Amino acid sequence: MAIKKFKPTTPSRRFMTVSAFDEITRREPEKSLLAPLKKTGGRNSYGRVTVRHRGGGHKRRYRIIDFKRDKDGVPARVASIEYDPNRSARIALLHYVDGEKRYILAPNKLQVGDTVKSGEDAEIKPGNALKLKNIPVGTIIHNIELKPGKGGQLARAAGTMAQILAKEGKYAHIKLPSGEVRLISLECKATIGQVGNIDHENISIGKAGRKRWLGKRPHVRGVAMNPVDHPHGGGEGRTSTGRHPVTPWGKRTLGKKTRKRKASDKYIIRSRRARKR
């Protein structure tokens, strides 16, 4: 994937970069795999803001993605590589030999005309999905299940990948994009390869309005607010917080640990916050 730069015709244009979309082969999505997507503006069913800094943005339609890869033993041809406004990765349209069509996350180097397959007899090549017990140690993977049959949940963003470090008993040791090493059942499925659109991390948004196109509203600092709006607010002129940093609701933040102990902690071999050597 190439990144496109612009001539500095305006101050915001100077630093803005976009994807060249060289890998995109089809402009219109497959209609049978679309669903309506209603915007919430960060509000819950009571109309109260539960997630701040959301609202607006360009209208989207949801692309139904096959994260489960449960159509085992049936080969499919990659018909097109498409843009998906709901995620950073590209998506690939598959045409199965029995006539069914599905979208999957497009792995790096997957091209139109390639054949992909899922199941125990699938080859170890990008785009194929197998259970972890059938994937060799050291293989790069993505779209990893946490529970067998639930569908991939880990390593789905553009350019992300995980690696199988070892297999022990009923579990595989998986190194995740964050650096965390975690035990995952060998019965869980994963897709071979790295997620495509690997240059996504190098894109510069360039201006505030482009964030608004994405449905993201301004993130205002507490010290820039009035006292009625935030515990850090108020004061004459520019002032410090005057206290330990807190959330808008008065809870300690910036250093205060809030993560509760979970039953799944026993599956974490190495924390993502462990010092990297």
From Swiss-Prot:
A Pfam family (short name) is Ribosomal_L2
Query: What keywords is this UniProt entry annotated with?
Result: Ribonucleoprotein, Ribosomal protein, RNA-binding, rRNA-binding
Q: Which GO terms describe its biological process?
A: cytoplasmic translation
Q: Which GO terms describe its cellular component?
A: large ribosomal subunit
User: Which domain of life does the UniProt lineage start with?
Assistant: Bacteria
Ranges of compositional bias, category Basic residues: 253-277
Q: Name one GO molecular function term.
A: structural constituent of ribosome
Keyword Cytoplasm recorded = no
Entries under Gene3D superfamilies matching the protein: 2.30.30.30, Nucleic acid-binding proteins, Ribosomal protein L2, domain 3
**InterPro entries per the UniProt record, alphabetical:** NA-bd_OB-fold, Rib_uL2_dom2, Ribosomal_uL2, Ribosomal_uL2_bac/org-type, Ribosomal_uL2_C, Ribosomal_uL2_CS, Ribosomal_uL2_dom3, Ribosomal_uL2_RNA-bd_dom
Which parts of the sequence are annotated with region: Disordered? 223-277
Q: Which family does it belong to?
A: Belongs to the universal ribosomal protein uL2 family.
Q: What does this protein do, in the record's words?
A: One of the primary rRNA binding proteins. Required for association of the 30S and 50S subunits to form the 70S ribosome, for tRNA binding and peptide bond formation. It has been suggested to have peptidyltransferase activity; this is somewhat controversial. Makes several contacts with the 16S rRNA in the 70S ribosome.
Its subunit composition reads: Part of the 50S ribosomal subunit. Forms a bridge to the 30S subunit in the 70S ribosome.
Name assigned to this protein:
Large ribosomal subunit protein uL2
Q: Which organism is it from?
A: Halothermothrix orenii (strain H 168 / OCM 544 / DSM 9562)
- Give the gene name: rplB
